[in-house]
């Protein structure tokens, strides 16, 4: 895993969120992007660091929204 790969995962997650009008759970992102859970979380971290997503804990999952 390197920075370039994580950036590609972040692009896939961002595109999925954008296509879904900005909101998904981690479970939904895994299903939509076909990424593994650790890859989805790495991508979310990348996007959060760039200020592009909000992350909210909802019961046993995490919801991610575009800003």
Spell out what each predicted region is:
Residues 24-27, 57-61:
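Mature soluble domains of exported/periplasmic/lumenal proteins and thiol-rich metal-chelating peptides
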Residues 35-46:
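Short amphipathic alpha-helical interaction segments
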Residues 1-14, 60-62, 67:
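Short alpha-helical segments that sit at the start of domains
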Residues 3-6, 22-23, 37, 55:
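Alpha-helix N-cap/helix-initiation sites
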Residues 20, 35, 50:
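Residue-level signal for short amphipathic helical patches enriched in basic/charged
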Residues 6-32:
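Short amphipathic alpha-helical interface segments
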